[in-house]
Amino acid sequence: MIRLILVLLIAILYLVIGCIPAFILWLIGKKNPDLKDRISRRMIQWIFGVLLFVSGTKVKAEGLENIPKDRAVLYVGNHRSYFDIITSYRLLPGITGYVAKKEMAKVPLLRLWMRYIHCLFLDRSNVKEGLKTILAGVDELKNGHSIWIFPEGTRNRGEEGSMLEFKEGSLKMADKAACPVVPVAIAHSADVLENHFPFIRRAAITIRFGEPIDLKSLPREQKKQDKVAANNIEMM
């Protein structure tokens, strides 16, 4: 319980105190958007590192060499824990935004930093708004910013190594932007908090990055989803 309280306090303090550097970054972004992006990324990676240290979480990464360094990609990963983003973001090269549920946009200071690192907010209950998010993601990818999506649409509370069915249109961004998909398998992230909430316990998380998949070689949407899902499960 103490670890959970510490993690929450640190996160809240960062969001509050971070208003000052956030304003400075806003000013920097007026003249140099790329510099703003790079600094924002480093700051978020730093605070995530602090949260992992306080929570006693160890992260093992495999397959980092599979991530293309010369272009944006769509990361497609399984989702079991709030710590999935905290652990994975620190490993990613280049600017990467996550697709988050629309409710996250209701938290003012959190929303600010998420937008600074190019996160998108998805309303799955509104087809029109969902399409806007997909198109925004396509623009991000075409502009060289990678996107991470959890195609299950929610945290999977099933057995370790399982995956929920992909939500419809989960791979549309990569399809329309003609960018590769990098499947990602995250193992044992729920051991940090979800498996024994409200206690945070020491855990070892493994994140495996698979080889990029060219969606153009797969003719139908279902085949594309099946291929990526199979790769994710195989890596778990």
Regions found by a protein language model. Name each.
Residues 1-28, 38, 42, 59, ...:
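Membrane-interfacial terminal anchoring regions of lipid-handling membrane enzymes
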Residues 18, 22-41, 53-54, 69-127:
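Catalytic core of membrane glycerolipid acyltransferases/transacylases, capturing the structured
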Residues 49-59:
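Transmembrane alpha-helices and immediately adjacent membrane-cytoplasm interface residues
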Residues 72-74, 146-150:
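Residue-level preference for the first positions of well-ordered beta-strands
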Residues 76, 137-139, 196-200:
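Short low-complexity, flexible loop/linker segments enriched in glycine and/or proline
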Residues 79-81, 152-156:
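Short glycine-rich anion-binding loops that position phosphate/pyrophosphate groups of nucleotides
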Residues 109-112, 145-148, 157-224:
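A cross-family acyltransferase "interaction/gating" segment
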Residues 129-138:
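Anionic-ligand binding region
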